[in-house]
């Protein structure tokens, strides 16, 4: 495991890493990554949005990551590439001072079952619990207070931040990142009603999480009732997201904060759900669907594209007037229909 040390790279090294065209001194060293406005003489910055072109001439950065068409006003060295934002993503990982920082080994306060299997170069933090039959892959970091339930598996090079709970019978793929407070494999919301009260339905399935998945803090993915809840490869899930039992999320999809997906709904690959989106149960969203924030989806979507529902914010007085008119729409429609029938009967 790496220790916390300052990051320093020459512009030549970064250009080679990013496959960028360097205009400037290849031996110039940079030690940080910052915005156009905040960057100092030892930093590299980036320009990925033309809105910020006006700030480029005044940046104090040593170098800027920029599209070839937008860097002519740069007062510093340039690393030119077609997708500066993607380049910024890679730079952010290079300059992350905490990347890989964790002491190798099992902390004395951790509880590890005899039948659990711990891979090589693993860090298990204070107060962790690794239950019977669990498998922790090579290079994993299990943060303080995290629990990996019986017969669950954490794939190689994954990281569980502090206080993550993985229930029994859960499979997490390689290179996953699970943030603090997320819960994988809790019981789904399953109950039968007899007319008087509720009777619990045991949730007998599991959860399968693919490779390269990131799950935000305080998000919940429930185990299947029968069969598994499945999260595909390279899925990105924001904080405070609720995914119910037997949901399936396709590869490369992204869910923003506070999304809620009811049971047995299937979301295709390359889908994007904005913040606060709600999906009713037993629906299917095809590949390539984008749903804008706070929308409610109550029917399946079979064509890729952008979908929205709801009403955007407006001054309260106008909203109240429109709300009153909305309540009158049914009666207005009936009156219009009667008028149209009367007009058609007129010679």
Curated annotation (Swiss-Prot):
Single GO cellular component term: membrane
Q: Per the record's keyword annotation, is Ion transport included, yes or no? A: no
Judging by the UniProt lineage, the source's domain of life is Bacteria
Q: Part of which pathway?
A: Bacterial outer membrane biogenesis; LPS lipid A biosynthesis
UniProt-listed Enzyme Commission number(s): 2.3.1.191
Alphabetized Pfam families for the sequence? Hexapep, LpxD
Where does the record place the catalytic residues?
A: 245 (proton acceptor)
The cross-references to InterPro entries, in alphabetical order and at most eight, read: Hexapep, Hexapep_transf_CS, LpxD, Trimer_LpxA-like_sf, UDP_GlcNAc_AcTrfase_non-rep
Q: Which GO terms describe its biological process?
A: lipid A biosynthetic process
Keywords per UniProt: Acyltransferase, Lipid A biosynthesis, Lipid biosynthesis, Lipid metabolism, Repeat, Transferase
* Reaction it catalyzes: a UDP-3-O-[(3R)-3-hydroxyacyl]-alpha-D-glucosamine + a (3R)-hydroxyacyl-[ACP] = a UDP-2-N,3-O-bis[(3R)-3-hydroxyacyl]-alpha-D-glucosamine + holo-[ACP] + H(+)
Any one GO MF annotation of this record: N-acyltransferase activity
Summarizing the function annotation, the protein's role is: Catalyzes the N-acylation of UDP-3-O-acylglucosamine using 3-hydroxyacyl-ACP as the acyl donor. Is involved in the biosynthesis of lipid A, a phosphorylated glycolipid that anchors the lipopolysaccharide to the outer membrane of the cell.
The record's subunit annotation is: Homotrimer.
Name the family the entry cites. Answer: Belongs to the transferase hexapeptide repeat family. LpxD subfamily.
Q: What is this protein called?
A: UDP-3-O-acylglucosamine N-acyltransferase
* Naturally occurring in which organism (per UniProt): Chromohalobacter salexigens (strain ATCC BAA-138 / DSM 3043 / CIP 106854 / NCIMB 13768 / 1H11)
Q: Which gene encodes it?
A: lpxD
């Amino acid at each position: 495991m790496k220790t916390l040390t300052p990051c320093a790279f020459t512009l030549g090294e970064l250009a080679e890493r990013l496959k960028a065209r360097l205009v400037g001194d290849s031996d110039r060293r940079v030690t940080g990554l910052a915005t156009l406005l905040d960057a100092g003489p030892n930093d590299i910055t980036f320009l990925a949005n033309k809105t910020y072109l006006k700030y480029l001439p005044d940046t104090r950065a040593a170098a800027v990551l920029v599209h070839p068409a937008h860097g002519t006003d740069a007062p510093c060295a340039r690393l030119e590439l077609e997708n500066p934002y993607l380049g910024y993503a890679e730079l952010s990982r290079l300059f992350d001072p905490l990347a890989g920082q964790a002491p190798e080994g099992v902390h004395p306060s951790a509880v590890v079952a005899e039948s659990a299997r711990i891979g090589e170069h693993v860090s298990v933090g204070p107060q962790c619990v690794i239950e019977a039959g669990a498998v922790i892959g090579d290079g994993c970091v299990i943060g303080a207070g995290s629990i990996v339930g019986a017969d669950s598996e954490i794939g190689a090079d994954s990281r569980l931040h502090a206080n993550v709970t993985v229930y029994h019978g859960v499979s997490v793929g390689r290179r996953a990142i699970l943030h603090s407070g997320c819960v994988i494999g809790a019981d789904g919301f399953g109950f039968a009603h007899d007319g008087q009260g509720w009777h619990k339905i045991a949730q007998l399935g599991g959860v399968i999480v693919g490779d390269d998945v990131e799950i935000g803090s305080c998000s919940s993915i429930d185990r299947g009732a029968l069969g598994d809840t499945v999260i595909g490869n390279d899925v990105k899930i924001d904080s405070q997201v609720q995914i119910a039992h037997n949901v399936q999320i396709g590869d490369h999809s992204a869910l923003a904060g506070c999304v809620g997906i009811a049971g047995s709904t299937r979301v295709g690959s390359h889908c994007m759900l904005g913040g606060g989106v709600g999906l009713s149960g037993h629906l299917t969203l095809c590949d390539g669907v984008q749903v804008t924030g706070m929308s409610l989806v109550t029917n399946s979507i079979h064509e890729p594209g952008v979908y929205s529902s709801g009403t955007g914010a407006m001054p309260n007085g106008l909203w109240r007037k429109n709300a009153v008119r909305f309540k009158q729409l049914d009666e207005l429609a009936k009156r219009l229909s009667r008028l149209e029938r009367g007009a058609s009967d007129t010679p």
